[in-house]
């Protein structure tokens, strides 16, 4: 565990109420990076922002955004501050995202209606997974589909063949996370990961945290 991180946490903790620290610990103890999701070139800020809010509420520590064609912008009226409590990782293209996630041990799972796709309820949860979501009109790029280890679909029983992106993310992530919480899989953050996130949260809570942290080295 990083001693510098622990030192900064110790200093900032003096400026946070016990009630707030307890709330932070409660959230940290339920955070996970075993599952994450990736948005590829989502152009509607309202939809993209809604997915960030969903990810934070469900307990994800990280989400990922590919910005090859469309820049990701947050709508504060939709995120309601959720973006400050989650790590938002951005990439210039799909390859960078895929390479990073694979190096971190994630299976690449593409949401798709192609014949190889399995139903969501049949997707196994034995490995870390990064679930990729594309636009409602065109779906994921050929690059992502070609690199995917697995393909998954949400069953649909009506005439329309596409869920709203924010709804799709909510259905998939909620389903997988509920199954994880009922399993014996060690899916929660380890102590080092919690410390790094704790420091992020403390910095969100403490005003002028940079000035306070600078005093550590003075």
From Swiss-Prot:
Name the keywords, alphabetized.
Methyltransferase, RNA-binding, S-adenosyl-L-methionine, Transferase, tRNA processing, tRNA-binding
Q: Where is the signal peptide?
A: none
Classification lineage: Bacteria, Pseudomonadati, Spirochaetota, Spirochaetia, Spirochaetales
* Positions that bind S-adenosyl-L-methionine: 111, 154
State the name under which the record lists this protein.
Answer: tRNA (guanosine(18)-2'-O)-methyltransferase
Write down the EC number.
Answer: 2.1.1.34
Q: What family classification does the UniProt entry report for this protein?
A: Belongs to the class IV-like SAM-binding methyltransferase superfamily. RNA methyltransferase TrmH family.
Entry annotated with the keyword Isomerase: no
| Matches recorded under PANTHER family | RRNA METHYLASE-LIKE, TRNA_RRNA METHYLTRANSFERASE SPOU TYPE DOMAIN-CONTAINING PROTEIN
Question: Which HAMAP family is this protein grouped with?
Answer: tRNA_methyltr_TrmH
Q: Does the record carry Cell membrane as a key word?
A: no
What role does this protein play? Catalyzes the 2'-O methylation of guanosine at position 18 in tRNA.
Top-level lineage group: Bacteria
What SUPFAM superfamilies is this protein classified in? alpha/beta knot
Q: Which reaction is this enzyme known to catalyze? A: guanosine(18) in tRNA + S-adenosyl-L-methionine = 2'-O-methylguanosine(18) in tRNA + S-adenosyl-L-homocysteine + H(+)
Name the enzyme's class: transferase
GO BP of this protein: tRNA guanine ribose methylation
Gene Ontology molecular function: tRNA (guanine(18)-2'-O)-methyltransferase activity; tRNA binding
The gene that this protein is the product of is trmH
């Amino acid at each position: 565990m990083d001693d510098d991180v622990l030192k900064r946490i110790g200093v900032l903790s003096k400026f946070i109420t016990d009630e707030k620290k307890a709330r932070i610990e409660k959230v940290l103890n339920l955070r996970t990076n075993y599952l994450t999701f990736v948005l590829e070139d989502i152009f509607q800020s309202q939809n993209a922002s809604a997915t960030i809010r969903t990810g934070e509420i469900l307990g994800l520590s990280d989400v990922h955004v590919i910005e090859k064609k469309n820049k990701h912008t947050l709508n504060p009226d939709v995120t309601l501050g959720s973006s400050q409590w989650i790590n938002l990782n951005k990439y210039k293209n799909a390859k960078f995202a895929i390479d990073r996630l694979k190096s971190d041990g994630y299976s690449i799972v593409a949401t798709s209606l192609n014949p190889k796709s399995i139903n969501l309820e049949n997707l196994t949860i034995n490995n870390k997974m990064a679930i990729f979501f594309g636009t409602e009109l065109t779906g994921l790029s050929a690059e992502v589909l070609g690199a995917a280890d697995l393909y998954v679909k949400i069953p649909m029983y009506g005439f329309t063949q596409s869920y709203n992106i924010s709804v799709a993310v909510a259905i998939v992530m909620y389903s997988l996370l509920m199954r994880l919480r009922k399993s014996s899989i060690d899916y929660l953050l380890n102590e080092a990961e919690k410390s790094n996130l704790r420091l992020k949260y403390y910095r969100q809570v403490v005003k002028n945290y940079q000035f306070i942290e600078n005093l550590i080295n003075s």
